[in-house]
C-alpha cells in the first residue's frame, strides 16, 4: 500500500534528496519494488576489490540510505494523509456552499429568462435573413432591369436607388417605433410561492407596520385636529380652510400642501433632521430594539404575530363586508338613505352650477370636520340620534352577524313549534345542535349548566366567561386520545369544568368539585407548547397523578382566579364545620 501511494504521489521524480548522489546508487520511483535494485556502474579492478572488502564503508552507507528512505516514506505517507483530509474537508465545505447558492438563486427563473433570450435571438436571426433576402432580390431585379437602352436603365437605377435610400432612412428613423406596436403573445409568468416560515411571517408583519406608519400617523394627526387637541393649531387650520373654500382656492391649497410635504421628504432624504406634524403634541412611539430571544419566547412572538394578523384580517373583512351589504340592500332601511342621497345629488348637479355645488360641499365638509364631529364625540347620545353616517355604518351587519341572525331566527321557530306541541323531542331551548359534529353549541349563557349537568345557578365567574383554552393531560390514562385532550377550562362558584372540543357527548367533559381538590399549583409542561408550556396541576383523591391543564397562554390570570375561588370555598367549608 505504501509503495502504491508512493508511486501515485511521486511518479516520475528522482529521490535524490533521500540518498546521497555520491555514496548511494541512483534509483527512481518507477523502479521501486520489493527490494531496491542497485545499478552497478562500470568499475575498474581496483574498485572491484574495494567493493569486495567486507569491512568497507559501502555497506554502512547503503544501510543508512535504506533507513533514511524508510523514514521519509512514513513522513511522506503522513503528508499524503493530511492532504487527503484537507481535500475531503474542502469538498464538504464546497458542497455546502453550492447547496446554499442553489437555494438562494432561483434556477427556474433563470431558465425561463434564458429561453426568452433564445427566442429573441432566433427572431433577430430570422429578421436578418429576411433583410438579406430582400436585398438580394433587389440586386437581382436591378440586374434584370438593365435593357439595351442605357438611358432608360440609368433612370430606373437612380429611381430604385432613391427609393431604397428613402426606405432605409424611414426605417432608421421610425423602425424602432414601428417595432414597439408589433403584437406579441402574452407571457404567463408563474410566481413561485414561498413556503411558510415563522421568521418570514414576523418580518412581513413588521414591514406592514412600517409601511402603514405614515398613513396611520396622518390619520392620527387629522383626528387630533378634529378633536381640537391643540386649540391654536385647529383654529388656524379651520380659518385657512374656510377662507380657501370661500374664495375657490381649496384645490390649490391641497396641491400646495402636497408639494410642501414632498419638499420636506426630500430634505429628510438628504439627511436633514425634520420632525414635522400637523399637531405638534402628537408624538410617535419609539420601538425599542429587541434582544436575543429564547425558543419559547420566539414561539410566543409567532403567536402574537398570528393574533395580530388574525385581528387585522378580521377588521378588513368587516369593512369590506359592510360595504358589500350596503350596496346589496341587505339592510334596506340603510341603503334607502344612500339611495335618496344619490338622487338628491343627481338632481342638484342638473340644476345648479358646479361652482355652487363645490362651495356648498366644501363648507359642509369643513363645518362637519371641525365643529359637528367635535360635538358628536363629546356627546355620544346626541351622535347616536343625529349622526347619519355613523348610524348607517354601525347598523350595517357583517356576514357572521347575518349568519347568527339566521340561526337565531331558525332556533326561535323551532322553539315556537316545540311550545305548541308539534315536536315530541327537539334540542333544548337556547341550544342549536350541529349534526355533523354531534356537539351542542349554546346560544345563551343559561345553557352552561346543561353541558356539564350542573345546577342552573352554576355559571362561569365573570373573570372567565369565555374560558381559557388549554389541553388536559391525564397521566393516569395510557391511550393517546384519553391522555391529552384539547378544550376550554371554566371555573364556577363550586366547580372546575373542562369542556372537550372534540367530545360527542358529555362523557369526555371533566367536572371537578373545588372542595375535592387536595392541591393546586403552577406547572410547566413543555417549553414548545403555547404560553411557554405553562399550565396548572390539580390533585384530587380520585387520581393517582395530578391532572395538568397545559398550554395556557394566560396561565397566571387563570391560576389566580382558580386559586382565589378555591381558597374561598375551602375556608367557607372549614368555617361551617367548626
Curated annotation (Swiss-Prot):
Polar residues bias (residue ranges): 139-154
Q: What is the lineage of its organism?
A: Eukaryota, Metazoa, Chordata, Craniata, Vertebrata
Coiled-coil zones? 83-135
Looking up Pfam families in the UniProt record yields: GRAM
**Gene name?**
gramd4
Question: What membrane topology is given?
Answer: Multi-pass membrane protein
Q: Name one GO biological process term.
A: apoptotic process
* Name of protein: GRAM domain-containing protein 4
The record's section on InterPro entries has: GRAM (IPR004182), GRAMDC4 (IPR037847), GRAMDC4_PH-GRAM (IPR037845), PH-like_dom_sf (IPR011993)
* GO CC terms, sorted: endoplasmic reticulum membrane; mitochondrial membrane
What subcellular locations does the record give? Mitochondrion membrane; Endoplasmic reticulum membrane
Q: Which species is this record about?
A: Xenopus laevis
Amino acid at each position: 500500500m505504501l509503495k502504491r501511494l508512493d508511486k501515485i504521489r511521486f511518479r516520475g521524480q528522482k529521490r535524490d534528496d533521500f540518498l546521497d548522489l555520491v555514496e548511494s546508487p541512483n534509483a527512481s520511483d518507477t523502479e521501486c519494488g520489493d527490494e531496491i535494485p542497485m545499478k552497478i556502474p562500470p568499475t575498474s579492478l581496483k574498485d572491484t576489490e574495494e567493493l569486495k572488502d567486507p569491512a568497507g564503508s559501502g555497506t554502512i552507507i547503503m544501510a543508512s540510505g535504506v533507513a533514511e528512505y524508510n523514514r521519509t516514506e512514513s513522513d511522506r505517507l503522513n503528508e499524503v494523509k493530511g492532504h487527503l483530509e484537507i481535500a475531503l474537508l474542502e469538498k464538504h465545505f464546497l458542497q455546502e456552499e453550492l447547496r446554499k447558492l442553489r437555494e438562494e438563486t432561483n434556477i427556474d427563473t433563470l431558465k425561463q429568462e434564458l429561453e426568452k433570450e433564445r427566442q429573441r435571438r432566433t427572431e433577430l436571426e430570422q429578421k436578418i435573413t429576411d433583410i438579406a433576402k430582400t436585398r438580394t432580390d433587389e440586386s437581382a431585379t436591378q440586374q434584370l432591369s438593365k435593357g439595351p437602352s442605357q438611358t432608360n436603365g440609368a433612370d430606373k437605377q437612380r429611381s430604385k436607388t432613391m427609393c431604397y435610400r428613402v426606405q432605409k432612412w424611414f426605417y432608421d428613423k421610425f423602425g424602432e417605433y414601428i417595432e414597439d406596436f408589433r403584437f406579441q403573445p402574452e407571457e404567463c409568468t408563474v410566481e413561485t410561492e414561498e413556503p411558510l416560515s415563522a421568521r418570514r411571517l414576523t418580518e412581513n408583519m413588521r414591514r406592514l407596520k412600517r409601511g402603514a406608519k405614515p398613513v396611520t400617523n396622518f390619520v392620527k394627526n387629522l383626528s387630533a385636529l378634529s378633536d381640537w387637541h391643540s386649540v391654536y393649531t385647529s383654529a388656524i387650520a379651520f380659518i385657512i380652510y374656510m377662507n380657501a373654500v370661500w374664495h375657490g382656492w381649496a384645490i390649490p391649497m391641497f396641491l400646495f400642501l402636497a408639494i410642501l410635504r414632498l419638499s420636506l421628504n426630500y430634505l429628510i432624504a438628504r439627511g436633514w433632521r425634520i420632525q414635522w406634524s400637523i399637531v405638534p403634541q402628537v408624538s410617535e412611539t419609539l420601538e425599542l430594539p429587541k434582544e436575543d430571544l429564547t425558543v419559547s419566547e420566539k414561539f410566543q412572538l409567532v403567536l402574537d404575530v398570528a393574533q395580530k394578523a388574525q385581528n387585522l384580517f378580521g377588521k378588513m373583512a368587516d369593512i369590506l363586508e359592510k360595504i358589500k351589504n350596503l350596496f346589496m340592500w341587505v339592510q334596506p332601511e340603510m341603503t334607502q338613505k344612500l339611495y335618496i342621497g344619490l338622487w338628491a345629488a343627481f338632481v342638484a348637479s342638473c340644476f345648479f352650477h358646479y361652482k355652487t355645488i363645490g362651495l356648498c360641499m366644501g363648507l359642509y365638509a369643513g363645518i362637519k370636520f371641525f365643529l359637528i364631529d367635535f360635538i358628536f364625540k363629546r356627546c355620544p347620545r346626541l351622535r347616536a340620534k343625529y349622526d347619519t353616517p355613523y348610524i348607517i355604518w354601525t347598523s350595517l351587519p357583517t356576514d357572521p352577524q347575518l349568519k347568527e341572525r339566521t340561526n337565531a331566527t331558525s332556533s326561535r321557530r323551532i322553539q315556537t313549534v316545540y311550545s305548541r306541541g308539534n315536536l315530541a323531542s327537539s334540542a333544548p331551548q337556547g341550544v342549536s345542535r350541529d349534526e355533523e359534529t354531534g356537539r351542542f353549541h349554546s346560544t345563551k349563557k343559561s345553557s352552561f349548566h346543561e353541558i356539564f349537568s350542573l345546577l342552573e345557578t352554576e355559571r362561569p365567574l365573570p373573570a372567565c366567561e369565555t374560558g381559557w383554552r388549554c389541553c388536559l393531560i391525564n397521566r393516569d390514562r395510557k391511550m393517546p386520545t384519553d391522555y391529552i385532550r384539547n378544550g376550554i377550562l371554566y371555573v364556577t362558584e363550586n366547580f372546575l369544568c373542562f369542556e372537550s372540543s372534540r367530545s360527542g357527548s358529555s362523557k369526555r367533559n371533566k367536572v371537578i368539585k373545588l372542595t375535592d381538590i387536595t392541591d393546586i399549583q403552577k406547572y410547566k409542561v413543555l417549553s414548545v407548547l403555547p404560553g411557554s408550556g405553562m399550565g396548572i396541576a390539580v390533585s384530587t383523591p380520585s387520581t393517582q397523578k395530578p391532572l395538568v391543564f397545559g398550554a395556557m397562554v394566560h396561565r397566571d390570570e387563570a391560576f389566580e382566579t382558580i386559586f382565589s375561588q378555591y381558597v374561598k370555598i375551602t375556608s367557607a367549608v372549614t368555617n361551617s364545620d367548626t
